[in-house]
């Protein structure tokens, strides 16, 4: 959508240039900003020109820049001990966006928009990520993502503050994780998204999103009993009501998912299955690349020494001779 009131787009290259005049907003990927009218918006400040590295992997934290795109996030390399790594693809695919959106939409934008179905909020809250916020006075503050989002399109960011990055503890990535999601239609907006995390020290955390107006975290020192978990879910009072799901339905499926994840955490740990992941081609890739990859026939493999060769394919049957009357013989 054209934002006809915008008069200027500024492209800062340093933090000193990152200032907001009245009527200006920060611009990341713009996938939400350009999706509807923005009354009173007179200028944009493009954060992507600041040159922040999308991903930085350290010993204790993985730093995700606010301008990191969804596509870049899904390319975060897994490590052998990162049992929770499949959550990245699972949550990213919950957005059900086209590859065009994946290549421009940013992690910071998804969190700052603060919609209940913001799947990257689900991911970061579930992994106990901390948001690093730049303040107008040149300082910064930190706040857990689970507390940054306070409601439907509301958060703790104040005028002039900018999301700089998210710090994901590698300890969370080493935790055993679970994931459940439901929508009213196969390709619908998330009605409820529940993740679990069992830390090496035994702490069990259930994070409920999409079905609630803000992330709801249920923490236990160890995997709780069924009644304790059900009681904790019942005490949640922020169930969301919109055309994508009624509050009582969201409460019911979230409780069901939480119990499934609790039971799953008590089972012996298995190697994590490959995360359901839909490859998103780059900006210049073909929109049909996914379909082509799924339907491609693998090349035949030559038999090894001593192996019996596969029998040749039968020759095609000869075409029927034409019938003089115009039919087939």
Residue positions per predicted region:
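C-terminal structural segment of proteins
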Residues: 1-306, 314-329
């Amino acid at each position: 959508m054209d934002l006809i009131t915008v008069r200027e787009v500024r492209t800062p290259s340093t933090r000193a240039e990152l200032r907001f005049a009245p009527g200006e907003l920060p611009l990341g990927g713009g996938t939400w900003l350009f999706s509807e009218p923005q009354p009173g918006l007179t200028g944009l400040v493009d954060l992507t020109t600041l040159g922040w590295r999308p991903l930085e992997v350290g010993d204790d934290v993985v730093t995700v820049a606010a301008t990191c795109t969804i596509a870049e996030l899904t390319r975060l390399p897994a490590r052998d001990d990162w049992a929770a790594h499949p959550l990245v693809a699972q949550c990213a695919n919950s957005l059900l966006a086209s590859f065009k959106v994946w290549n421009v939409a940013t992690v910071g934008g998804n969190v700052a928009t603060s919609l209940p179905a913001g799947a990257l909020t689900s991911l970061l809250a579930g992994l106990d990520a901390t948001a690093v916020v730049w303040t107008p006075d040149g300082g910064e503050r930190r706040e857990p993502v689970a507390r940054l989002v306070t409601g439907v399109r509301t958060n703790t960011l104040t005028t002039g503050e900018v999301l700089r990055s998210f710090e994901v503890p590698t300890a969370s990535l080493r935790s055993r994780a679970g994931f459940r999601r439901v929508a009213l239609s196969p390709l619908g907006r998330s009605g409820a998204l529940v993740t679990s995390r069992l830390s090496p020290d035994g702490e069990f955390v259930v994070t409920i999103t999409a079905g609630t107006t803000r992330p709801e975290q249920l923490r236990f020192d160890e995997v709780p009993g069924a009644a304790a978990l059900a009681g904790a879910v019942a005490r949640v009072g922020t169930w969301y009501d919109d055309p994508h799901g009624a509050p009582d339905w969201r409460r019911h499926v979230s409780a069901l998912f939480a119990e499934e994840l609790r039971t799953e955490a008590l089972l012996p740990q298995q190697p994590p299955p490959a995360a359901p992941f839909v490859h998103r081609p780059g900006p210049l890739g073909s929109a049909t690349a996914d379909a082509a990859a799924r339907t491609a026939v693998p090349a035949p493999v030559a038999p090894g020494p001593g192996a019996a060769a596969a029998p040749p394919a039968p020759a095609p049957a000869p075409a029927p001779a034409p019938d003089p009357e115009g039919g087939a013989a």
